[in-house]
């Protein structure tokens, strides 16, 4: 019960922070950053993905996707905190949240959701990791190396698109 209450408190902080950000972008970004980091910590602590990481096959793939997504969620929170303190990092925050966290969640849940919704049978194999690896490698290239070299940022962005196409195939 305490876990659920804490989770609800974090969600309320996140929704409140999002509302404040919409009203006062420059001032209230840290009200969004802190709940993002808290959510990443909560998920990383209580999600079953920590245990299924040591399984085999599809459960392990899903755990890798989820845990990588939680790491990007923490990065997004840290980046938004930096933005609140006046550091440049909006691009990092948006891409860590949008591509790193959200797309990782989509990739991790798709093998269960798509067959249920579309009535398609997906055969899991090691190739499932290719789009995931491409996504995270290209995102690192885009937001870490790309800070110092704009050409590499552009290449990272193009490789992000390739990763999404690989996933769609």
Where are these regions (language model features)?
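Hydrophobic membrane-spanning alpha-helices of multi-pass integral membrane proteins
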Residues: 11-18, 66-74, 99-102, 128-142
């Amino acid at each position: 019960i305490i876990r659920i209450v804490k989770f609800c408190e974090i969600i309320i902080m996140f929704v409140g922070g999002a509302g404040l950000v919409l009203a006062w972008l420059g001032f209230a970004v840290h009200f969004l950053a802190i709940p993002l980091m808290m959510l990443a910590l909560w998920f990383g602590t209580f999600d079953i993905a920590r245990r299924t990481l040591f399984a085999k096959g599809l459960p392990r793939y899903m755990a890798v996707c989820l845990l990588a997504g939680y790491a990007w969620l923490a990065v997004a929170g840290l980046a938004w905190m930096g933005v609140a303190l006046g550091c440049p990092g909006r691009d990092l925050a948006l891409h860590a949240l949008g591509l790193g966290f959200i797309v990782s969640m989509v990739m991790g849940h798709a093998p269960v959701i798509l067959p249920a919704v579309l009535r398609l049978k997906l055969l899991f194999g090691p190739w499932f990791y290719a789009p995931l690896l491409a996504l995270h490698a290209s995102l690192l290239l885009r937001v870490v190396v790309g800070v110092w070299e704009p050409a590499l940022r552009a290449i990272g962005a193009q490789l992000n698109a390739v990763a999404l196409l690989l996933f769609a195939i």
